[in-house]
């Protein structure tokens, strides 16, 4: 029997929000908190707007995390990332905000966000940021040294 999860997005009619909204994120209890899986989530169609020119920016967002007590619900993550569509922000700021919002929601053991943005003006921007609780600081440092 499936426990009551109180999720708002999964299984419901989808309402798309076109402006950044961290309240779209939802979590559910980690069914195996004693394990340390490294979970990878990939959003191949991330878009936001340049805060200066209002031109669209396109990228692939990679989120990797080791959950503690909560895991992110994937449809809510999709809607959250979609909410950046009309949000004006630099690539680095988007990646930092995604990390901070997920850390606040999940309180994970470890979490990283990497953005692989399409070139504009011949330069591709690929920001990486990570977070770890005290027991995972060494892992965090190694991941930072080996970031894409």
UniProtKB/Swiss-Prot annotation:
Pathway: tRNA modification; tRNA-queuosine biosynthesis. One of its GO terms (cellular component) is cytoplasm. It is an enzyme of class 1 (oxidoreductase). It is found in: Cytoplasm. SUPFAM superfamilies: Tetrahydrobiopterin biosynthesis enzymes-like. It catalyses: 7-aminomethyl-7-carbaguanine + 2 NADP(+) = 7-cyano-7-deazaguanine + 2 NADPH + 3 H(+). NCBIfam families: QueF-II (TIGR03139). This is NADPH-dependent 7-cyano-7-deazaguanine reductase. The lineage of its organism: Bacteria, Pseudomonadati, Campylobacterota, Epsilonproteobacteria, Campylobacterales.
């Amino acid at each position: 029997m499936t426990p009551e999860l109180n999720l708002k997005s999964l299984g419901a009619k989808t309402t798309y929000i076109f402006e950044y909204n961290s309240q779209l994120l939802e979590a559910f209890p980690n069914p195996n908190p004693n394990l340390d899986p490294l979970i990878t989530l990939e959003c191949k169609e991330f878009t936001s707007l340049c805060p200066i020119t209002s031109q669209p920016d396109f990228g692939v967002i990679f989120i990797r995390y080791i959950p503690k007590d909560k895991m992110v619900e994937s449809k809510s993550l999709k809607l959250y990332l979609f909410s950046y569509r009309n949000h004006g922000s630099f690539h680095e700021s988007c990646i930092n905000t995604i990390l901070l919002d997920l850390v606040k929601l999940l309180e994970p053991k470890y979490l990283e966000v990497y953005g692989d943005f399409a070139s504009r003006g011949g330069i591709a921007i690929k920001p990486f940021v990570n977070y770890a609780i005290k027991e995972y600081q060494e892992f965090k440092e190694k991941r930072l040294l080996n970031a894409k």
